[in-house]
Amino acid sequence: MTTTVGIAVREGVVLATDKRVTAGYYIAHKQGEKIWKIDDHVAATMSGGVADLQSVLSFLTLRAREYKMEYKRPIPIRALVNYVSLILFYSRPYIYIVHSIIGGVDDEEGAVLYMADWLGTVTKERYIATGSGSPYAKGALEVGYREDMSLEDAVDLAIKAVKAAIRNDPGSGEGIDVVVITKREGFRRVFTAQQKIVLAE
């Protein structure tokens, strides 16, 4: 149970998650980090079984490093997404319980966002939410998303979406993490006033 959100705009990609980690109906951790840095230009959110996610995302991180060493350039995000799709598809019938948003910026596609589920299905998205709080977050995204929105507006919308989930979903809570990925600055964590308000509620 969790909420993760991704938004792609012209300037870059925004990933946002809540911080609550649950085991069934038990709150196991209140400061969980659910955004995994794969490389400077790409990251993924974590929704599903923690051990499975850590395993799969470790594979992706290793693949990104191998690619960079071999070809002297960052791995294209589509290649990384194809790789995770194969891992998830060929793990059947012993599937990884993984639902992840993979987003970043590369030379081939610019700012791009993909969703991968535990069966290996991959879809390209402009905005997406996963986890138990996703119905609430997706509603906020559908109302607020615009194709021409700025990166700053996308950060605000991502926070609103996760906040909507925190207010309505018992599996989401404790605060919000936000990461922005741009071509110029790469991967960076963002902290905003809205997050402080969420933490105080």
From Swiss-Prot:
Which SUPFAM superfamilies does its entry note?
Answer: N-terminal nucleophile aminohydrolases (Ntn hydrolases) (SSF56235)
Q: Which residues form the propeptide?
A: 1
Places the protein is found: Cytoplasm
Instruction: Please indicate if the UniProt record lists Ligase as a keyword.
Output: no
Q: Is Protease set as a keyword in this record?
A: yes
Activity control summary? The formation of the proteasomal ATPase PAN-20S proteasome complex, via the docking of the C-termini of PAN into the intersubunit pockets in the alpha-rings, triggers opening of the gate for substrate entry. Interconversion between the open-gate and close-gate conformations leads to a dynamic regulation of the 20S proteasome proteolysis activity.
Superkingdom of the source?
A: Archaea
Any one GO cellular component localisation term in the record: proteasome core complex, beta-subunit complex
Which Pfam family, giving just one, matches this sequence?
Answer: Proteasome
> Which keywords does this chain's UniProt record carry?
Autocatalytic cleavage, Cytoplasm, Hydrolase, Protease, Proteasome, Threonine protease, Zymogen
Q: What residues make up the catalytic site?
A: 2 (nucleophile)
The biological process GO terms on file are: proteasomal protein catabolic process
Substrates-to-products reaction catalysed:
Cleavage of peptide bonds with very broad specificity
Give its E.C. classification number: 3.4.25.1
Q: Name one GO molecular function term.
A: threonine-type endopeptidase activity
Similarity section:
Belongs to the peptidase T1B family.
State the protein's purpose. Component of the proteasome core, a large protease complex with broad specificity involved in protein degradation.
Per UniProt, subunit arrangement is:
The 20S proteasome core is composed of 14 alpha and 14 beta subunits that assemble into four stacked heptameric rings, resulting in a barrel-shaped structure. The two inner rings, each composed of seven catalytic beta subunits, are sandwiched by two outer rings, each composed of seven alpha subunits. The catalytic chamber with the active sites is on the inside of the barrel. Has a gated structure, the ends of the cylinder being occluded by the N-termini of the alpha-subunits. Is capped at one or both ends by the proteasome regulatory ATPase, PAN.
This chain's protein is named Proteasome subunit beta 1
Gene source species: Pyrobaculum neutrophilum (strain DSM 2338 / JCM 9278 / NBRC 100436 / V24Sta)
Q: What lineage is on file?
A: Archaea, Thermoproteota, Thermoprotei, Thermoproteales, Thermoproteaceae
